[in-house]
Amino acid sequence: MSDIRLDSATFFKRAAKIFDSWEKPSGDTQALEDINSIAIILGDPNDEVASYTKTTALQLWLLGYEFPSTLMVFEKSPRKVTFVCGSSKAKLIRQLQPSDGIEIDVKVRSKDATAAKETMEEVVASLNGKFGSLPKDRPIGKLVDEWNSAVESKGDLEVVDVAIPISAVLAEKDGEELKTIITSAKLTSTVMINYFKSKMESIIDRGTKMSHEALAQLVEEKIGNEEKGPDMKLWNKNPSLGEIDFASSEFVYSPVIQSGGKYDLKVTAASNNDNLKPGIILANMGIRYKNYCSNMGRTFLISPSKKQETQYTTLLEVRKEALALLKTGAVASDVYNSVHQSLETKNATLADSFLKNLGFATGMEYRDSSFLLNAKNNRELKENMVLVLTIGVADLPDAKNKGKTYSLLLSDTVKIGQNGAVVLTEGCTRLSDVVMDMEEEEEEDVKPQIDKKPKINNSPKKPRSSTVGGRVLNAKTRGANREQATQTTAEKIKTNQQRLHAQLNADGVKRWEADAGGKNGAQQKVVKRYESYRREEQLPRAVEDRRIYVDEQRQSVVLPINGYAVPYHISTIKNVTKTEESNHMVLRINFQSPGQIAGKKEDMPFEDPDANFIRSVSFRSQDQRHMLKVYEAITALKKAAVKRETERKELADVIEQEKLIEVKGRHPYVLKNVFPRPGPEGKKTDGNVEIHQNGIRFRPDGPASKIDILFSNIKHLFFQPSEKELIVIIHVHLKAPIMLGKKKTSDVQFYREVADMSFDETGGKKRRARYGDEDEIEQEQEDRKRRAELDKLFHDFARRIETAAQAQQFELEVDVPFRELGFNGVPHKSIVALLPTTNCLIHISELPFTVITLSEVEIVHLERVQFGLKNFDMVFVLQDLKKPPVHINSIPVAHLDNVKEWLDSCDVPISEGPVNLSWPAIMKTVNEDPHAFYAEGGWNFLTGSGSDDGSEESEEGSEFEGDSDVFDESSGSDEDSESAFEGDSDSASAESLSDEGEDWDELERKAKRADEKHRTDRGGDSDDDGKKKKKGSRR
């Protein structure tokens, strides 16, 4: 508390306002006339009733902070304010030095009961006759008991309720207060219009099941709290907000969302656990900013009747009249009666259901009942008062749903002016803003469905989040027009692919245009200089023996050549061989030199490739033991050097993450009892995942190292439910790899096994009392229930990670795989299930993981696509041409059409061919001069059909050659391997592709009939015939 500074100027300014109203009472402050002192006491901090009470409001208004267990006594003449509180609070309050004719007296309440009692009696002794208080706040605590005891002991004191005079003083806002309330109102209207409205419409439109309470929680999280920051993506949508101190922001109450025929328009209403339903939806929410409250309430009409629209329009008219009546000098009861009478004239039914009040004053205290806008309140409204105006009608009979009712509501925060009220929470009031007609949209979608589909596919490039969803719907096309739909799909793919390939080639030429005519596409190789010894004196003494010496410390080999000791760094040595000849041993040392036959690795760069190089040097010696020792030393040194260089290259892209900033003040959100993969120490370790301010942390239960992942390094966040799996997963794919133990990784996941939640009741009473399948059925039901609970737990936690990351201005969304679009393949060594997501193709169920980001894919080439083969391969060429293509092999041919349709829907260029290609050679050619590659047609060579010669090369990979028949577009085409978008011939039509499986079955049946006929003709007595028949039946 030492860093708290009180605003002395504000305190004395506002205290003077109280004394001025006290010395010249009029109107609502008339009750202060016969009072000589006012005692305001706030009880213990755990007093839940103290929330938004007048006592709290007065303390915040004067001091800017809440001081629990504190007594304030105002004395009229002379002007004096006495504080009774603990020592720590007294130290802060003593910042207030006497000023503007107001004395300050701070009395420290002792921890000793006797001394505390004497202090309180001393304060009470200064009171005479009547004194003002706020008895309705009902504070509790030891300080309150001491005060009540001292007042009773004196006996001649009379308590007067000064709630109305205090309300009158607080009601009129100054410039700073109005500025803060306007900011509070902007926050409220922003979250209502820019988040709740769109979120609610999305839930209704998609038919998502979400409870009122859950939706209210999502709204409440947008403001942020101590565990996570605010959602700046939302708040930045309102540029008029400016700089906001979100630490001083909170919701006045949890947002109230109501639908489905159950409505409560009272201030005490709360969201229930029922799901959000179409129809009439009411939403109320309010934000408190720097202790000042605002409120906003709206009615949203989903497929309303004409009557409901008329009723809402009537409320808008009445609201407009009410705003005109709320001006300086107006009486609260007159305003209510005029509005009610106007409504009765327009619609008597609505008037009968009209609320009993139009609203209330607000500010530091959310609801000040002293200024209720009802028929009985005769108090005048003053300029710069701030009210919550509520126009509402309750329990109207619903003609659509007999037996049910609905309510309509419009609530705003308004400021009283000379000529009427100004709305501070404007927006989303017009009928067009709040009406959402679902039925008309459905009717429009049904009729022109077939006509609209081609237009959708020919439209400009769409976000991938929508295309994947569209793919799911397209896959469900059924009915009499199946062949027409299939043909339409093939034509759409063909048209879209032509556009994508043209765009790909044009973008490639433009991207590499700066390198035209040069070889800058390939990465320039750096010539490394090595200096084993700077001076001759540094050579080891062992070289004086004129023998080969291996210097491990300098990573060099010193060779005796013509009487001189010549050092060679180990990097210049390619390898060493030894040959035994009778009594001699020959040691041959081969050096790195240009012009050698290139293997899989790139050639070593040389400063001057045209210089003279020694390729090898041989030494012959009778000391076989020494030569063997030298051989082993050089070999070991070379292996160590190669290992170091390999590790350096592997760790080149590993980053050093910034420090994780932990959440302070509260415990972070935690997902307990999970296992990370890969493990921090290479072992299976359980622990908890925590969400902190700028990232997530895995905290192991054992001695293993913790894992920190920053939001800035998260590229994709996946949630994979336990459907058809034994585990439920939250998977993080990183932008740059990090070190886990001694290994680097680009993927970290946290999972929990579903099986470990199961248990058996073998031997229990229930098991012995039942027989049959009842136990198994019950166990299956329990298993499904546990799976659903676990999925929800992990999905909610993934959503919390998403929210926390977005609050830190990172674009991160939870991606869930589409299992219905999945297919099997071999990305590494074994067959696994590969699942498309909105942005990726993934396999995260087991190690090693596969995550391919579709936005980084240049083109996808389908290999071994030809009639008769059961599998095909898929090659992802990445936009970063330096990276090797990603291969997924042995995909069942039954998934070919679905894979092509999915890739096309994601706007990924596709090509296909009958054989495997030599991709290292292709990529080497591309990287040598990318501009020339794209200028000469780019990847168009992949879209040509395979030649007749190439059709015989079944599953073996072919070497890439620029003039190969495989890529010669003028060569003959194989109709069976032709792609769906590669020609207009009837043989390549969508119909023949879709019926390919049926043709094969028909051929098999014909072969079987021919075998039977052949066996009959031969008399059926040949063993060979029998064997052939059996073999044919298994074909």
UniProtKB/Swiss-Prot annotation:
Q: Which GO terms describe its biological process?
A: constitutive heterochromatin formation; DNA repair; DNA-templated DNA replication; nucleosome assembly; positive regulation of RNA polymerase II transcription preinitiation complex assembly; regulation of sister chromatid cohesion; transcription elongation by RNA polymerase II
Pfam families xref list: FACT-Spt16_Nlob (PF14826), Peptidase_M24 (PF00557), PH_SPT16 (PF24824), Rttp106-like_middle (PF08512), SPT16 (PF08644), SPT16_C (PF21091)
Q: Which SUPFAM superfamilies match?
A: Creatinase/aminopeptidase
Chief location category: nucleus
- Any GO MF annotation of the entry: nucleosome binding
Q: Where is this region: Disordered?
A: 440-471, 944-1035
Q: Which GO terms describe its cellular component?
A: FACT complex
List, as start-end ranges, the regions of compositional bias called Acidic residues. 949-985, 993-1002
Record family assignment = Belongs to the peptidase M24 family. SPT16 subfamily.
Compartments, record wording:
Nucleus; Chromosome
Protein known as? FACT complex subunit SPT16
Relate the protein's function as given in its record: Component of the FACT complex, a general chromatin factor that acts to reorganize nucleosomes. The FACT complex is involved in multiple processes that require DNA as a template such as mRNA elongation, DNA replication and DNA repair. During transcription elongation the FACT complex acts as a histone chaperone that both destabilizes and restores nucleosomal structure.
Residue ranges annotated as compositionally biased, kind Basic and acidic residues, are 1003-1027
| Species this chain originates from | Cryptococcus neoformans var. neoformans serotype D (strain JEC21 / ATCC MYA-565) (Filobasidiella neoformans)
Give the coiled coil ranges. 637-657
| Subunit note | Forms a stable heterodimer with POB3. The SPT16-POB3 dimer weakly associates with multiple molecules of NHP6 to form the FACT complex.
- SMART domains in alphabetical order: FACT-Spt16_Nlob (SM01285), Rtt106 (SM01287), SPT16 (SM01286)
InterPro entries (UniProt xref): Creatin/AminoP/Spt16_N (IPR029149), Creatinase/aminopeptidase-like (IPR036005), FACT-SPT16_Nlobe (IPR029148), Fact-SPT16_PH (IPR056595), FACT_SPT16_C (IPR048969), FACT_SPT16_M (IPR013953), Pept_M24 (IPR000994), PH-like_dom_sf (IPR011993)
